[in-house]
Regions:
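Active-site nucleophile-His-acid catalytic modules used for acyl/amide transfer and hydrolysis
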Residues: 76
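Generic beta-sheet signal
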Residues: 3-5, 32, 79-84, 116
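Conserved P-loop
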Residues: 1-72, 127-129
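Amphipathic alpha-helical interface surfaces
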Residues: 13, 61, 65-68, 79, ...
Length: 133
């Protein structure tokens, strides 16, 4: 399952994603991974949630990010939830490219039974593609 949260910067998406991760970790049977482009949320997360700062790995585009996700999933078969905070802060891509990436991630989630939650910052003038809704 994949769930995408789209809203303007500063609307509280990160806070809600952290709360969701911490709450779900209490009942999760598998492992959880939280992916962000900076380490600030790390101290707010339950310590059993694996935190990954993408700045440490040089992730720049959709291909890099998808490869990193595949590596994370292939290295731990017990992953149940993945939380991605600020996708457009992590990678440089267009809304159309991100829709294609999200479709590829959705295929991964179906194949491996993983839940993925993604925060995306949008401008008021940007229209969210159908593939992301």
């Amino acid at each position: 399952m994949i769930q995408v949260f789209c809203a303007r910067r500063g609307s509280g998406k990160t806070k809600r994603l952290i709360e969701l991760a911490n709450h779900q970790q209490l009942e999760a049977k598998g492992d959880s991974v939280y992916i962000d482009d900076d380490s600030r949320p790390m101290l707010q997360l339950n310590r059993s949630i694996r935190f990954i700062d993408t700045m440490e790995y040089g992730v720049r585009d959709c291909s890099d990010f998808y490869g990193m996700l595949c590596g994370i999933i292939s290295s731990n078969y017990d992953i149940e939830n993945i939380y991605i905070d600020g996708l457009f802060n992590i990678i440089n891509c267009t809304m159309k490219e991100s829709a294609q990436l999200i479709k590829r991630i959705a295929n991964l989630t179906d194949r491996f039974g993983i839940n993925v939650y993604i925060n995306i910052n949008i401008n008021g003038s940007e229209e969210v593609p159908e593939g992301i809704k």
